[in-house]
Amino acid sequence: MKQIELKILDPRIGKEFPLPEHATAGSAGMDLRACIDQALIIKPGETQLIPTGIAIHISDPGLAATILPRSGLGHKHGIVLGNLVGLIDSDYQGPLMVSCWNRSTESFRLEPGERLAQLVFLPVVQATFEIVDEFKSSERGEGGFGHSGKH
């Protein structure tokens, strides 16, 4: 297991609200919670930036973190990420914030400490480009946008 530095920015983290952790041995993500002082109403079509109460420093350029939506919030309530996926670079040290977008037709009430997104760590390959005049032939070639099937 890889250790990542975590700074607690909200004193409720680790006391009233649990630290992010993997819920099961097979969990890919760790829940991030809304570190707000009172319930927040997110109106239909509205986007709110929600603090999580933590900052992380990954430091390893071979890793990055993503902030992803929780499936139940999106499916049942229309609450998804305003930026679809949040990317946390290894050298970022600022607070983790979650952009919540209510794509439903009804207002959503977000409570303090409520789980609102998940943090997933991923390996990163930092690539460089080699300029070429032609590519080596591949099975797919230039086919894209539905080229390989019905959709």
UniProtKB/Swiss-Prot annotation:
Required cofactor names: Mg(2+)
Pfam families: dUTPase
Biological-process GO terms, alphabetical: dUMP biosynthetic process; dUTP catabolic process
GO molecular function: dUTP diphosphatase activity; magnesium ion binding
InterPro entries for this protein: dUTPase, dUTPase-like, dUTPase-like_sf, dUTPase_trimeric
Record function comment: This enzyme is involved in nucleotide metabolism: it produces dUMP, the immediate precursor of thymidine nucleotides and it decreases the intracellular concentration of dUTP so that uracil cannot be incorporated into DNA.
Entries under HAMAP family matching the protein: dUTPase_bact
Protein name: Deoxyuridine 5'-triphosphate nucleotidohydrolase
Lineage: Bacteria, Pseudomonadati, Pseudomonadota, Gammaproteobacteria, Alteromonadales
Gene (UniProt): dut
